[in-house]
């Protein structure tokens, strides 16, 4: 077997570097399944705005706390001609180590009993801090709010891409 010539080294080395970099790039922006469950409270500041706070668990985060701002932006058409609410929400989920994940949620809230609303919609990851800096992702939102007791429960299910550098 003969040793590689300078010309062969010049061709093979860049190919090996390109392969290594493509593997690192693929790993750096891999889309992963994401699930989050959260329970907490809702406090209305005005007839159309509220804050939320809760605790729960999320994949890639472990135990979390949540803080959100909710705005009713219009009416939603619900089953049996019930009138519900179209809602926009910004929520921040904080992991035990302090890393944060921020989301924008849009949902339709429809009454299921007096003062109790079921919400379905979508979420988009808008960023974060720590390992969630520059994160992206999206999925579905499902939740229930009992405005009589001021309690909420919600779930997010979708994907997240954590851009590791």
Model-derived features: where do they sit?
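Glycine-centered signal
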Residues: 4, 23-26
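Beta-strand-enriched cores of mature, soluble protein domains
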Residues: 27-165
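Bacterial N-terminal signal peptides that target proteins for export
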Residues: 2-13
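Bacterial N-terminal signal peptides
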Residues: 13-23
